[in-house]
Amino acid sequence: MEIEKTESAEEVFAVPEPDVPWVTIVHNDPVNLMSYVTYVFQSYFGYSKDKATKLMMDVHHKGRAVVSSGSREEMERDVQAMHGYGLWATLQQDRK
């Protein structure tokens, strides 16, 4: 009797790679004003008005924008902060 090899847990679930950076992504929503999103990017991340406006326009027109990158812990903190401001944000590994 021959036994077929099935997929192992390692093959099914992607394990985060420690050396791959993480990113915080802010998604478009129908609630927050563009001026408010720009304000949040300036006040929390310390971005210039021009950079904050560009990121806000990416969120508005493309539906999302990467607003920060770093370790998983840092990105979890940034996502929680965005939620605190009422923005929809997620994190993911930046696999290019």
UniProtKB/Swiss-Prot annotation:
Domain of life per record: Bacteria
InterPro entries assigned to the protein according to its UniProt record, in alphabetical order: ClpS, ClpS_core, Ribosomal_bL12_C/ClpS-like
GO BP field: protein catabolic process; proteolysis
Function of the molecule: Involved in the modulation of the specificity of the ClpAP-mediated ATP-dependent protein degradation.
Assembly and interaction partners: Binds to the N-terminal domain of the chaperone ClpA.
Family the entry assigns: Belongs to the ClpS family.
Protein name: ATP-dependent Clp protease adapter protein ClpS
